[in-house]
Each structure stands twice: as structure tokens, then as C-alpha cells.
Amino acid sequence: MRVGCDIIAISRIEKIHSRHGKNFLDKFLSPKEQILIKNPATLAGLWAAKEAASKALGVGICELCSFFDIEISKDEKNAPKLKYSQKITKNFNITQTSLSISHDNGFAIAIVAIV
């Protein structure tokens, strides 16, 4: 089992999004993921989730794992769900993933566990 965690100030993501708009979103979110954005807190949560997912691999966001190798969606109970690309799943021998995202007091945090 490996674990990754990321925390970010919601205001930081909000500022970047205000400055760069859709160009910023297109750099790290697929069109399907962009539909999940309801407010700055959910946007920051998506950022934290992708960062945490890359850290769980032990590599961070880099040439081995891009933002688009990580897909965030919702399950039938509206809980966040994580899926890695086939390349990542195979190269890192991943059989299970778990993602938790929370927002409080101006911060978004995400924790990812992979087996």
C-alpha cells in the first residue's frame, strides 16, 4: 500500500483560475472532470486529488505521470473516485485505489491510497 496527500489554499487556486480561466483548467482537467466544478473549493479539491494521486505513486506530476494519467469522477453515492490510465496501472501494478477529498477553513485536502 502507498499513500499520497496534498493540501492547498482554495484562494490560491481561485486566484490562478481567475487570472487564466479555461486555459488553467485545460492544463490539468479533462472536459468530463471540468463538469464536476461547482465552486472554488471543488476546483481546489480536484487539484489536490491529482497531486495526491501522483504522490502516492512516489513520482509526483512529471513525465512518468501527467495530470491526464489521473481521472477523477464520482461514484453512484457521489463520492470521489480515482482511476489511473492503463499505462500507470500497469507500470505501477495498481489493483485498488481510494480517494478522499475534504474542504474546510479555506483549504482543500486530498488523500489517496493505492494497492
Curated annotation (Swiss-Prot):
Binding site for Mg(2+): 6, 51
Swiss-Prot/TrEMBL keywords: Cytoplasm, Fatty acid biosynthesis, Fatty acid metabolism, Lipid biosynthesis, Lipid metabolism, Magnesium, Metal-binding, Transferase
GO biological process: fatty acid biosynthetic process
Keyword Lipoprotein among record annotations: no
Subcellular location: Cytoplasm
InterPro entries associated with the record: 4-PPantetheinyl_Trfase_dom (IPR008278), 4-PPantetheinyl_Trfase_dom_sf (IPR037143), ACPS (IPR002582), Ppantetheine-prot_Trfase_dom (IPR004568)
Annotated catalysed reactions: apo-[ACP] + CoA = holo-[ACP] + adenosine 3',5'-bisphosphate + H(+)
Superkingdom of this protein's organism: Bacteria
Recorded GO CC terms: cytoplasm
Lipoprotein in keyword set: no
Cofactor(s) required, per the database record: Mg(2+)
Gene Ontology molecular-function annotations: holo-[acyl-carrier-protein] synthase activity; magnesium ion binding
Function: Transfers the 4'-phosphopantetheine moiety from coenzyme A to a Ser of acyl-carrier-protein.
NCBIfam families named in the record: acpS (TIGR00516), pantethn_trn (TIGR00556)
UniProt-recorded name of the protein: Holo-[acyl-carrier-protein] synthase
Organism this protein belongs to: Campylobacter jejuni subsp. jejuni serotype O:6 (strain 81116 / NCTC 11828)
